[in-house]
């Protein structure tokens, strides 16, 4: 929490002289705060601190009553790069949404559209999903990679609807 607050304060201070292209950083930290408000521990970890970070940009682990942690791996992610940070936070936040929803964020009927959009806008993601994931993980990761392509306002809205407004 202390690391998150320090990093957020430094980022917001930098934004006071930043260009408009860095606006996504505000949304990334807004989304991190929303994630934290669900009770999820949010952490920004270097590889030397977190063995699970090696080779990953980030990860989310949820085991009911055992573990609920969202991590951005700072050795692989330049947290000062707006796009890079947003991609990781939006992707991993989708897994938080999936945990809140007990499965996919959107109805399974939308998956073909999700895959078509990935093939059209981010064919490297479509190929990665096809080669690396199997079973239910395919659909879960497709949603997460698709979420990276969405405007920040949409991701924030999806998160709010899925995790914060759901009773």
Q: Positions of the model-derived regions?
A:
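Non-transmembrane alpha-helical segments in soluble domains
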Residues: 32, 86, 90, 94, ...
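Short N-terminal segments immediately surrounding and downstream of signal-peptide cleavage
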Residues: 22-45
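Soluble non-cytosolic domains of exported or imported proteins
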Residues: 25-26, 79-88, 134-142
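Metalloprotease/metallohydrolase-associated module, dominated by Zn2+-dependent proteases
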Residues: 30, 107-167
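Catalytic Zn2+-binding segment of zinc metalloproteases
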Residues: 93-110
